[in-house]
Amino acid sequence: LVGNDDAVILDSQVHDSVQTAVQFLRNRDVRVEVIRHNRLDMLESRIKALKDNYRKIWYMADGVYSMQGDFAPVKDLFRLADQYEQLHLYLDDIHGMSWAGPNGTGWVLGQGEYHPRLYLTTGLTKAFGSAGGLLIYPDEKEYQLIKNTSKAFIFSIQMPPMVLGATAASARIHLSPEIYSLQEEMQTKVEYFNRRAKELQLPLINESISPIGFIGVGKPDTGYNMVRRMMNQGYYFNLSVFPSVSYNNTGLRIPLNRLHTFEDIDGLLTEIATQLPQALEDSHSSMSEIYKHFKLVA
């Protein structure tokens, strides 16, 4: 997709899989830049600076960001693409799949009409419940180009039968009215998670409608301490730590799913509220340091 006379601009928090793929472009001396997270003013400034010297300008970002569950400003990106014809959008929406969008097609596709310069990647390995990737192109020509020249297509194999069966079963749910009742149920649990976290005065970094909760703990030492403490209480979740996030932006990454009960959510958050002050004391840190590192208002 990206030619030698194109330029690439990465959001600083775009998924590592995209950043890794871009390393192949660097080997071809393709110009690659990184801008601060969701800073469309910086994006527009770089478009203006690059547009006279490059054929296409690619902006690569996530639809829903994997660490803190926040969103790309999709509608604003579409407006920017309307304004600058050279701008092409490459968005990874795997974390927006199923729980959002019409028929569970994802966060990005739930934001309006498909933009003619949008290249969308998503996948079946998260909320969809099976395995495999999805690539959506603006026209048949681009589709045929990738299908017939991409190493990933040329050298990959077909889905194993059991994965294909799970994919077909999930697709039938997505194509039925059932998907909307499942999405609604998921949202009630996300809302409950956000509400209880606030009631317990936990440092919830984004009060997001996405099912990725992120409770900031600051230092990596505090994060590792919290994981050990919570495992001892029977709770397991991801720790977001450097280099996935900035060094002092360690956090407890808590992906919710529909099978979690309200009691599960309440028990988890209550235990975090109990253990966090002790973990902070152990690492000679404090809640005020968490608020400082994440630029939160107490």
Regions found by a protein language model. Give the residues of each.
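Short beta-strand
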Residues: 57, 156-157, 203-208
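A short glycine-threonine-serine/GTX helix/turn-capping micro-motif
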Residues: 150-159
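Short, glycine/polar-rich helix-capping loops at beta-to-alpha or helix-loop-helix junctions
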Residues: 12-22, 142, 248
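Conserved PLP-anchoring active-site segment centered on the Schiff-base-forming lysine
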Residues: 1-16
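Conserved PLP-binding catalytic core of the aspartate aminotransferase-like
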Residues: 180-194, 200-233, 244, 248-252, ...
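Active-site PLP attachment segment
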Residues: 109-145
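Active-site phosphate-binding strand-loop segment of PLP-dependent enzymes
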Residues: 30-90
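Structural motif of enzymes handling amino- and sulfur-group chemistry
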Residues: 158-179, 185, 189, 198
